[in-house]
Each structure stands twice: as structure tokens, then as C-alpha cells.
Amino acid sequence: THCISSAASDVYKRQTINIDGKTALLGDKVYYRVHIDASRLTDTAYKVWRLGAVDDYDEEYLTLDAKHVEILDETGRDRTGEFNIQDKDGVLYAFAKTVDTQIPATGETVPGDPQPDDLKAYSEKTDKDYDPLKDPSIDQSLLGHTYQVVMPMTVTKVKDGHTVENTATQVTNDKRDKTNTVTNPLKEINPTKDVTVQVGGDSIDGKSVYLNHTFLYRLDSSILPPGRAYQTVTDWGGTDQLNTEYDQYLGNWAVYASRDLYRDGQMLAAKGEKIAGSGFDSSKFGGNLFTVDADDNGKVTADATQAYLDLVSADNEHEAGWVLYLQCKRIAVADEVPNTWTETINGQPRESNKVVTKTPDMTPSIHLEKVDTPTLKQDGQEQADRDDPKQALKMDADNIGITFIITNTSKTDPATGDGAWFKASDLNLDDSTIVGDAHVDMDSLTYPADWDTLVLKPGESVSVTGTLKGVKEGETHTDRAIVTGTPLVECAPSNGDPFNDKTDGGEDTDPEYSTGDVTEIDGKQLCADTQTASNTDDWNGYRAKPLASTGTAVLGLAGGALAVLLAGGSLLVFRKRHYAQGSGRHTAVNAGK
């Protein structure tokens, strides 16, 4: 006979659990057992010169630990030392050693040593190759017993659907008896990785996770098949190395059954039910089924407890599997954050697929341009934008229309175009005079009709108009504007436990947001982010001096020189004063020259 059993200890080696036809997984340690039956070979009329077995195994998928092949008799006694053993090209040869043999016909003793050095060649000999007068035979006291050749194998390659076959042949002198062939279908199993926002939610693999938002890494275990050749599960868990530059693990985790879980044939937890987690009450299971720990370097380790391993080991009738969620927070902008996890079952590691998320720079910002309305209408924004005193407008009157153009310049997610929004009614426009005494009348600004409901999305602009009043003849004027606003961004869920004790992960609960008050616009939940200020923008203008009367022509030269001197002196003082205020860009100029 010839059977196969799975085991991990010496105790098991002496038990024959027939696993013919059962499924083998990568890393499984199985013991093929080849039987040599010499029980009926006593009192034969001839000497038994050769006794052993040849076992042809599938070396592409199985690796034999030839050093630990053992031969046991029917009492379980180790008889390995009495046999020669060789492993060659996927075939194991085990033959009883030749011993010093007395030849009655000659009265001589033929030495048993040296032993055959090539057991393949030895196994292929026939009776014709054996000379009973010159060749040694085996120890005849081995006869009358049965032996078991125990071959420790490891499944080192799997291919779904492939069946490994193992056929042994007993060799007694010239007689060859094929034993039954043992077959084991191989099953390829693999863990998978995903990333999502909520338990059971759609995958966001390849998509964006926004800065300071929480999300879930999803770690699906392999699915253990029923009818396993190696039924005992000694360990089941894995590690996930987070990139702490981008991902902060928040300490919240949960495990759900991905297949029904049984105890003593009764369902203990249904597929999709939460069976472990941070702060989870596991009393119904008689204790924790999983532990999850993280080190300071962002390596998260999950392990099934002995309680869970015992449940799975005891049930070889059903599939087994689980899914772990880890709550993380994205803490930096990134083009690409890859993540995988490594699952280990019975000491055999398996790598998952890779998921990738990105975090676009979506910094909220607003931009302000301040222009004079007449030039804007006639020549366009560029001509009307008088940031520099050299571009100052020569004004014909003491007042002029001013237009403030406010643009949402927030950075966006290239994939979706999403970015911060600004409610126009939240914008606060401020204008102050830098040079001169005139000012923009901020109490009589004109806003668009839909100002109270208007929302500026990225790239959109709005114009507010007002009037600059009080520029006197001969005076230069500079005023500076700035706008502040509160950006509205997609609400970031809080760092609280997203799983709570509901089996669905609490998707029906109202999310608590970690950022500001919630505003709903176009069905989107938006939250207030930190207030943002625009650039400052200047506008420059001047009015010419009134023409001097002709009666002072004689004094013109001296008077003119004195005026320039006085003006120059006052300009220097003025310059100094403004530099002292840190406003080096805005120097007074005699724009009337």
C-alpha cells in the first residue's frame, strides 16, 4: 500500500492520515508514505537478495527533504539505518543494505560492503545480474515485517488545476509490484490588497486621497479551500509596511469574516460579520480572534489568535478567510503612494497585489486684480492693471471707476478637477490708500446680483466695482487691495473609529467631520478650511498740476528751480517714510514731469 499524510511533528509521522485526493497549497508540508510488505517472505526456498522501494514523485512541484526520510517498521521502530537511501531526479530509492553473507555451497562469507553507490542502477538489476555464489544479499531478519518509508515533502510550486501524482513500486528480488498512485490537486491561493473610504466601499485604487483625509487599507486574506491535505493551520496573519512620510496609522482596525465561520459544525459568524477589531467585544467568540499591532516605523502586524486557528483547523469542510481594514490618514502631498501586504500561512509568505493612491496639491488660494474700469472696458485687463507707479493713469477728474477682479486660483485634482470653492458672500475685500489722500469708497461697492448665492469654483472669477474719489490736481495716488475668504473643501471624516460595533462598519451613521462647519452646496458636503488671503494688488494714478499764470514768467526759472528743490526734498522725506514702513516697492514719483 502507499498513502500520504500531512504532518508537522514526529508524533504525526507515526499516524497515517490518508490525504489522497486532498488539496495541497504552496508551502504545505506533507508526508508521503510508501509501504514495503515483507511479511510473507519468511521461510522462502531462496534467499531474498534485494528488498526496497522506488518512489517517483513530482519534483517540479514537490521538494523532498531527503536527509529526513525515515523508515519505520510496523511497531513504529526506526529502522532507517538498515537501508540505503538516495534521491535522484525526482525519484527516491530505498533499499535494504547488503550484509556479510555466508554461501553454503562454498562455505565462504561474502562481505556486504561496499554498499551499492548507485541505487538507480542497483534497482534496475535483474536476477541474471545476481550471482548467488559471489554476491551478498540482505539481512534475512528483515523479512516477516512491514515497513513504511516516510518522505517529508514541501509543496514548492503550485499551478491551479495541476494534480501532483506519486507512484511507488516495491522491488523484491526480481519482482516489481506497483502500489496505488496517490494524487493531490494543487491550489494557488493569494491575498489581495485594496484601498477604500469605508467598509465595503468602492475601490479608490489609482485615485486620489486628499490631504488630511482618512481612508482604509483593505487586506483580504487568501481563501483556504476545504479538503486540505494539510488541515492544521499553525499560523495565519501578515504585515503591512506603511510609508510613514505619507500615511499615518490611526490605530483603528477591524476584521470581518469573508467566509462563514463554523464551530463544531454550527455557524459562529456569517460572511461579512465583524469578528475582531479595536475596542471590539469578542466575548461571543470566547476571546479575541485577531490581534493587530504597529511599531514606530509604520509596520502593522496582524495575527490570528490560537482561538481562530483552532476553529479553522477543526473545520475541513468549508472555505475559510477574513478581511482586515486599517484606518489611516494621508499627511503629505504625493504623486504616488504604493502599498502591498505580505500574508503568511503556516510559515509560507505570499505577496499581495499593489495598490496606489495619490494626493494632489489642492492648496486653496484666491487672486485679486485691481484695475480702472474705463481702461478695462476700452483696452482690456492688462492695460488697466496699473501695479507700478510707472504705469500710473493720468486722470481727467478727481474720481474714477475701479474694478476688483477676484479669481479662485485653488489647485485642483488633475483627475477630477475638484478643488476648494469660495462662497462670494464669505469674501472680504479691503482697500487702503498708500500714497495721497484719496480713497476708494468701500461702502458703495457694486456687487453682482447673485452675490449671496454665488460660489466660485476653481478657475472662476467675479468682479466687484467701486469708485476712487478725491484725487486732487497735482497729486499722485496709490491704493492697495486684498481679499480674504474661507475655502470650502470636501469634508475630511474625523479620526474616530469608523467601524464601531455595527457589522456594516457604521455606514449609516452620520460622519463626524474634523474640519469646520458643514455646508451643503449642489448636494456636496463641504467644510470650512483655514481662511485664505489673496495677494495684495496696487493701482496707481495721478492728476496733472494746474497751469501757472503767464505774469510770473520772469521769475519762472528761479521759482521753478526752487519748486523742484522743495518738491525733491519733500519727496525724499516721503520716500524715507515709506521705506521705513517696509514698502520699498511703492516710492513716490513726480509723475507730472
Can you describe what each PLM-predicted range is?
Residues 16-18, 79, 84-88, 93-141, ...:
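Surface-exposed intrinsically disordered loops and tails
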Residues 24-49, 207-236, 387-419:
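Short beta-strand elements of extracellular/lumenal beta-sandwich folds
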Residues 175-186, 350-359, 496-542:
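Terminal edge beta-strands and adjacent linker/stalk segments
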Residues 564-593:
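C-terminal membrane-anchoring or membrane-association module
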Residues 1-8, 12:
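Single conserved hydrophobic/aromatic residue that forms the stacking wall/gate
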Residues 34-35, 97-165, 219-220, 296-342, ...:
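Low-complexity, intrinsically disordered segments enriched in Ser/Thr together with acidic residues
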Residues 542-559:
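Extracellular Ser/Thr-rich, low-complexity/disordered mucin-like segments
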Residues 46-119, 233-304, 410, 415-458:
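A surface/secretory-pathway sequence property marking extracellular, secreted
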